[in-house]
């Protein structure tokens, strides 16, 4: 067996991507961590959404958000971002199925960073309603993405959540796992 530097590099790269133990697989575990419904209040998720916002800004050749703008180090509630459910947790327009609650409600595809004021103003209304849709027509590029979907498809359900999740997961893979 060759023990050259290239071989050592390949083995270490493999271990970094696939884990040092069978049960510790960075590719699988990392993706499950950010796509599983039970982790939706984790700080790391806010970080991923912040990085996704800056990824979209960079693609559009726009200035990036600073961490301070996103984490609100100045404790100014008016500019603080909160983790928002695009379709609300307790809607006033529909009753969710058990499957929807388990698979989609807290999915990363249904979560966005939103200011406290807008999150509060949305209440529990349908995100496809005109007044709510307009809240996503903002300076944030991740919101523009949601806004365009809501305007063109006039709904936010399993399909839109899955499509958004897939875009964010692709971003995670491209930036941290490959």
Residue spans for each PLM region:
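Single conserved hydrophobic/aromatic residue that forms the stacking wall/gate
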Residues: 1-9
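Short, exposed beta-strand "edge-strand" segments with a Pro/Gly-rich flavor and a Y/T-containing core
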Residues: 1-2, 76-79, 150-155
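In a subset of proteins, long, contiguous C-terminal domains/tails are tracked
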Residues: 131-178
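Betabetaalpha-Me/HNH-type nuclease active-site subdomain
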Residues: 13-146
């Amino acid at each position: 067996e060759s023990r050259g530097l290239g071989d050592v590099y390949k083995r270490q790269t493999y271990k970094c991507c696939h884990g040092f133990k069978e049960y510790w697989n960075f590719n699988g575990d990392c993706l499950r961590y950010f796509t599983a419904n039970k982790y939706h209040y984790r700080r790391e998720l806010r970080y991923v959404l912040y990085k996704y916002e800056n990824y979209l800004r960079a693609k559009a050749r726009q200035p990036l958000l600073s961490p301070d703008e996103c984490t609100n180090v100045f404790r100014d509630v008016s500019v603080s971002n909160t983790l928002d459910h695009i379709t609300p947790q307790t809607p006033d327009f529909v009753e969710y199925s058990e499957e929807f609650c388990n698979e989609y409600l807290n999915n990363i595809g249904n979560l966005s960073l939103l200011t406290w004021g807008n999150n509060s103003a949305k209440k529990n209304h349908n995100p496809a309603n005109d007044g709510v849709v307009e809240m996503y027509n903002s300076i944030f590029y991740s919101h523009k993405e949601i806004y365009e979907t809501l305007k063109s498809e006039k709904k936010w359900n399993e399909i839109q959540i899955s499509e958004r999740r897939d875009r964010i997961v692709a971003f995670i893979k491209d930036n941290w796992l490959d």
